[in-house]
Amino acid sequence: MQDIVRPIDECRVCGHDDWLDVVSFGSTPLAGNLLGDEDDAGGETLFPLDVVVCRRCWLMTLRHVIEPDVLFGHYRYVASDAGSIIQHMRKLVDLCVERIGLTDGDLVVEFGSNTGAHLELFRQAGPRVVGVDPARNLAGVANDRGVETIPAGFTAEVGEEIATRHGLARLVYGRQCFAHIPDIHEVLNGVSALLAPDGLFFVEVPYLVELLKNNQFDTIFHEHFSYFSLGSLCTLFESHGLRVVDVHTADVHGGSIVVFAAPAAADHEVRPAVAEMLAEERSQGIAEERTYREFADRTERVRAQIRELVRGVVADGKTVAGYGAPTKGSALLAACGLGHQEIRFCSDTTVLKQGKILPGSRIPIWSPEQAAGHVPDYYLLLAWNYAPEIIDNEKEFLENGGRFIVPIPEPRVISAESTL
């Protein structure tokens, strides 16, 4: 166990070791480690899930780190093909083309590139593209679709290899993966080795302010090492000679920020949005201990409310299933103490997940076609970040008397007569 999990000694952003304890979820299985029928129910390994925040730079982080090979060697998260996500990815392509004038032949590199879906959109706009992803199965899918992808973590060595083979990159970026990387300094070493002097680097990360404000405790799981504010990212990037020049909000994954940085010597205008967001973070109390204590109190209350609502529905003789089987859904079920006794199944469109079993809760994952033959009275909307899109697509379920339980920011029941 000591070989694969260890407590962190210092903040991965600023190097200090002055921690404020925020919340503990005890020891839980890996939320993304889906099981097969052959897996022994008693054989799941439990890992501590404790959250702390650095009092120096206000990075929120897990207190323990699990070896990435254990977490991501055969990763089953496939980038969503939901319409809202595709639209968002297209907007990012357009923004980058406009922001730095990407032209045919320029090099774009994405780390944590998953199946290459976003790079494919960049390629359609003209640039050359290369992906980097440590999940060998997903890198294989990307290569099969014609998006060159290196099956590795993004490091200085990998950055140098790409630069040698393809030249320097005008754009290097990572979407919704930066929080998954324990050694973020090594990633930034890779950026420094690869980024052209006039290039841009960006990361898209779930936004800590939204997590705290909207009780998004289910986004806290072992695969997410870090929870970033703009302030903590500014501190991190400055230590690598990068200056934050722009920031955008994105209504994806519960609320995210897209943070652009450039070499400090580059002639990139710093947009007013940077100072505006930093000021807003101060006003939201991101650097005040009370903010994190209040989040912990709300988390405890909302977990109990979700548990009591679901168990009350089941006690009334109604059936409940999960809608979606995202990693955060597994984390929510574990945090609320819900399992197969309350939740009959989870319906998910991801083929790689179908036929598997959620860790800890032991809830089977079915395809939508299989679920259609066992329509529950209630769906617990585990993929709540797509709630408007899902509810709009499931009008027939609601019109036939079905109900959705939307758990975050606090549980509420949606019927044909009610709205979000």
Swiss-Prot record:
Keywords for this protein: Antibiotic biosynthesis, Methyltransferase, S-adenosyl-L-methionine, Transferase
Example of a GO biological process term: novobiocin biosynthetic process
Domain of life: Bacteria
Pfam annotation, one family: Methyltransf_14
Pathway per the UniProt entry: Antibiotic biosynthesis; novobiocin biosynthesis
EC number(s) from the headed UniProt entry: 2.1.1.-
Molecular function GO labels: S-adenosylmethionine-dependent methyltransferase activity
PANTHER family cross-referenced by the UniProt entry: BLL5978 PROTEIN, TRANS-ACONITATE 2-METHYLTRANSFERASE-RELATED
Similarity comment text for this entry: Belongs to the methyltransferase superfamily.
Misc: It is unclear whether NovU acts before or after 3-epimerase NovW in the novobiocin biosynthesis pathway.
Protein name: C-methyltransferase NovU
Biological source species: Streptomyces niveus
